[in-house]
From Swiss-Prot:
Origin superkingdom: Eukaryota
Protein family according to the UniProt entry: Belongs to the GatB/GatE family. GatB subfamily.
Location in the cell: Mitochondrion; Plastid, Chloroplast
Taxonomic source organism: Micromonas commoda (strain RCC299 / NOUM17 / CCMP2709)
Assembly with partners or alone: Subunit of the heterotrimeric GatCAB amidotransferase (AdT) complex, composed of A, B and C subunits.
EC number, as in UniProt: 6.3.5.-
Cellular compartments per GO CC: chloroplast; glutamyl-tRNA(Gln) amidotransferase complex; mitochondrion
UniProt name for this protein: Glutamyl-tRNA(Gln) amidotransferase subunit B-1, chloroplastic/mitochondrial
Length: 543
């Protein structure tokens, strides 16, 4: 059981339509940007001992995961994306006097599952706090969050590291995961002529449940951080606690970057980078920020690196200063007086754990035991539906390596080009794919024939018909009789006496010509290994 509550809020006071606010002027200036660009240019031309010092980045990431609950965290307003502004608001999420928050059990359940998925210690008792700051997207003037007693702490994620950064699997530590409510969304409009700039506030998102996941500063490059973010999104999607959509803001990553000389234990000045709506953009933003800080240090301007929040400007491909970064004291945390401590028993945690699916790390290990190449494993694990489809094909008797090869290659290429076709709705059933791969594995049909008939299977032209029946009807069985293949080779050699004479005279490049000719003569049905063996024996008889 869980305990957390307060009186039910009133649904009255709802008001639709955008709220217009004066636009906050940005703190960055073109002059400052030019100074930073000049520092980078100056650093590239410096020589001497300072220029030879090697620097490394120290990177941690705070990830806000929006939970896919039907209602907000502390009221009954719908938690939906893209509806008309300010149509899912109530006195509770707008902070009206006399209203009290009531914690959703679904939020707790999903937060516990996410904590378990992060290999973290789920606390049986946690509490909520008020994080206070004043900004137009925060209607209450404070955010309900968790400060010193989060719902989960400690933990790790095993991340597949890009080859450029050494490859392999690296364990990234998780400091904590805590529940909080989201803020509203501001849309900024620039000044036009005599019309000043302004912002519109949409509070539909205010109060939507989040879990903030704070990593240890264990990462060193933009690619590593992007790999960590992608793995965290996989976990979120496998657990079905959120959709992890960066472009819609349901997963947002704030990256803390500092630079220090290699070998030094003390951290440099931490800079927060925000507003990256893809993992590719995240990698580029971090690498730019590392270069910016390194350039300033090398130019003797390290004191210009200040603790601040910077935004990634996709158009200019650079980070731009937004505001001074607040410290913990600035938020004036204190216990949320309207919510009791969150307490649940072991039975509740076990119930949450029992509903969890197999997670990406365990699937990778299982597929590695099947002997699948790491590249194929990564492609398969990327999509939960693809894993389910592949497992169904294995259960139907598909040879693992053959099936993974076709699924991650030709089938995925077809899906990429097809419009509005998901793995689950693909005409090619897992049973058909299993039979298809078995026929190739057993040598009944060749890979060439497989490529010829696969498009028809993917497009559903043969319905649910057995692949074996299709092969029989079309006469596509592979020719593996040595005498039959020898007759095909003889016909090819007899039809091309000039090329045969040139080959036997030393023009070895003509081998490919004869291989192709045999393939065409057999209609693509000749056993490749056997036909190559017989062809080479026949070609070399007169040399």
């Amino acid at each position: 059981m869980i305990r957390a509550g307060g009186p039910s809020p009133s649904p009255r006071g709802r008001r639709a339509g955008p709220i217009r606010l004066p636009r906050r002027a940005p703190s960055s200036t073109p002059t400052r940007a030019k100074t930073e660009e000049k520092a980078s240019a100056d650093a590239s031309s410096r020589t001497g001992a300072d220029a030879e010092v090697q620097f490394e980045a120290v990177i941690g990431i705070e990830t806000h995961v929006q939970l896919n609950c039907r209602t907000k965290a502390f009221c009954r307003c719908a938690a939906v994306y893209g509806d008309e502004p300010n149509t899912h608001c109530c006195p509770t999420c707008m902070g009206y006097p006399g209203t009290y928050p009531v914690l959703s059990e679904a939020v707790v359940r999903k937060a516990v599952q996410l904590g378990l998925g992060l290999n973290a210690r789920v606390r049986r008792r946690s509490k909520f706090d008020r994080k206070q700051y004043f900004y137009p997207d925060l209607p209450k003037g404070y955010q309900i969050s968790q400060f010193d007693e989060p719902i989960a702490e400690g933990g790790y994620i095993d991340v597949v590291i890009p080859v450029e950064d050494g490859g392999g699997v690296r364990r990234i530590g998780i400091t904590r995961a805590h529940v909080e409510e989201d803020a509203g969304k501001l849309t900024h409009y620039p000044a036009k002529g005599d019309t000043p700039g302004y912002a519109l506030a949409d509070y539909n998102r205010a109060g939507v449940a989040l879990v903030e996941i704070v990593s240890e500063p264990d990462m060193r490059t933009g690619r590593e951080v992007a790999a960590y973010g992608a793995e965290l999104r996989r976990l979120v999607r496998y657990l079905d606690v959120g959709d992890g959509n960066l472009s819609e803001g349901s997963m947002r990553c704030d990256v803390n970057v500092s630079v220090r000389p290699v070998g030094r234990e003390a951290f440099g000045t931490k800079v927060e980078v925000k507003n990256m709506n893809s993992f590719n953009a995240m990698s580029r933003a971090i690498d730019f920020e590392i270069d910016r800080q390194t350039a300033l240090i090398r130019a003797g301007k390290g004191d210009e690196i200040v603790q601040e929040t910077r935004t990634w400007d996709e158009g200019r491909q650079c980070t731009v200063s937004m505001r001074k970064k607040e410290g913990l004291a600035d938020y004036r945390y204190f216990p949320e007086p309207d919510l009791p401590p969150l307490v649940f028993d072991e039975a509740f945690v076990e119930k949450c754990a029992s509903a969890m699916p197999e997670l990406p790390g365990a699937i990778r290990a299982r597929y590695a035991d099947l002997g699948l190449p790491p590249a194929d494993v990564q492609v398969l694990v990327e999509d939960k539906e693809l894993v389910e489809y592949f497992d169904a094909a294995l259960a139907a008797g598909a040879p693992a390596k053959q099936c993974a090869n076709w699924l991650t290659g030709d089938v995925m290429a077809w899906l990429k080009n097809a419009k509005d076709v998901a793995v689950s709705s693909m005409p090619l059933s897992a049973t058909q794919l299993a039979e298809f791969c078995t026929l190739i594995e057993d040598g009944v049909i060749s890979g060439k024939i497989g490529k010829d008939i696969l498009p028809d299977l993917l497009e559903g032209k043969e319905g649910n018909k057995s692949v074996g029946d299709i092969v029989e009807e079309r006469g596509l069985k592979q020719i593996s009789d040595p005498k039959e293949i020898e007759a095909i080779v003889d016909r090819v050699l007899e039809a091309n006496p000039g090329q045969l004479e040139q080959y036997r005279g030393g023009k070895d490049k003509l081998k490919g010509f004869f291989v192709g000719a045999v393939l065409r003569e057999s209609g693509g049905r000749a056993n490749p290994a056997l036909s190559n063996e017989i062809l080479m024996r026949k070609l070399n008889e007169g040399r």
